[in-house]
Amino acid sequence: MSAKSNKIGVVQLTILTMVNMMGSGIIMLPTKLAEIGTISIVSWLVTAVGSTALAYAFAQCGMFSKKSGGMGGYAEYSFGKAGNFMANYTYGVSLVIANTAIAISAVGYGSELLGATLSPLSIALWTIFTLWLATVLNFGARITGHISSFTIWGVIIPVVGISIIGWKWFDGSMYVNSWNPHNVPTFEAIGVSISMTLWAFLGLESACANSDAVENPEKNVPIAVLGGTLGAAVIYIVSTNVIAGIVPNLELANSTAPFGLAFAHMFDETIGKVIMGLMVMSCFGSLLGWQFTIA
């Protein structure tokens, strides 16, 4: 009875799945997608469908394979130790690139928060410093987990907030005028932005890693993974597209802190700075968690 009471239900697992994905991947996307235009909403829809399919595949893998190690364990179940190595090696390489991107995002928001103008060399040096600082401050799973569970709110509050209240400042004509500002061929524009939107779903692969802690995992894990992925997709699509109707395309494309810029347009510079501070906090917490994952 006590063992069952310690397990989490489908609603809790769904929320956890969304939180796992809503790290720092979203915070620079409005800027990157503004370079393509609001036509990127098509890429969001394609990516959401693909990510949902991947999430379901991972959920099913977790049901068939009880090996530990996430994707490596799943690969070993079918392809042996060579499969385990290839899965973990390629995943590790992707995380190295991901962590660098997170650190760059933190530096970008931090420079905007402090009103500093950084050269490319300065950005590189501050990025290296941020990566090493996160490495040094990794004190283990428990402390890192507590820090990450707190700092994640730095991105959840602005992203969910703008998805709900941002419509008050949304300008439909601005959104339409930003559809394809550089007149890039449709399929080329969609293809380029898909590689960006897929980044926001980093973390879905870890959503079903601990099925032992879930009530009725055969039923609840697939529901939670699919529900969490779809929920995150809705928030991502709404938030990035609302911003495109609040901030002019050229200004958004040149910003290093798009969410802070959007809140500054909605309210004032002070609120914008607060949002930038929350985003820096979230980036660093996310970086701590992913550095621990690599280790």
Go through each PLM region and give its residues.
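Hydrophobic alpha-helical transmembrane segments in multi-pass membrane proteins
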Residues: 20, 24, 28, 43, ...
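Membrane-interface loop-to-helix entry segments
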Residues: 110, 120-172, 184, 225-230
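Helix-loop junctions at the membrane interface of multi-pass solute transporters
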Residues: 31-32, 77, 135, 190, ...
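Hydrophobic transmembrane alpha-helices that form the core helical bundles
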Residues: 31-35, 53-130, 134-138, 143, ...
